[in-house]
Amino acid sequence: SHFEGSTEEKETATVVDHDFMSYTQGMKFFDPHMHMSSRTTDDYQALADAGVVALIEPAFWLGQPRTGLASFKDYFSSLVGWERFRSSQFGIKHYCTIGLNSREANNEALAEQVMEILPLFLQKEGVVGVGEIGFDDQTAAEEKYYRAQLEMAKEMNLPVQVHTPHRDKKKGTE
């Protein structure tokens, strides 16, 4: 367990977990926003044990800038291929959204290249929308590529999964 605390707190947590598992036993769950690329197969097993039968994994910023188009292709390919396979081993249906994350929109030369390949990936099996797109630093480039991806979603008749900024959220959502 990731729960840290006194022995009494741990015992209480176990009781709560047991009660919760009894209460939800037999129920099925769908998680609409989960980043599985960074998780282990133990996490898939825990999800299956908890009754999760399907999830959507949005494309996102991996914590460091991608510096070339090949890294985007590899990442998008893993979402539509490898992660679907991994989740299927646990009886979980894996869907995803594909998009240029706001943090990576500020490298405009690379962003233009990514925009060219997005339609190819948006047509793949298991892709259910454009995302996760939106704002982070709230720059003109982020606005440009957000609007371009909204237009792409409209043309392809796909829903959009929106990312709101971590900082200055009010400004970024007005």
Language-model features and meaning:
Residues 1-174:
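Mid-domain alpha/beta scaffold segments of enzyme catalytic cores
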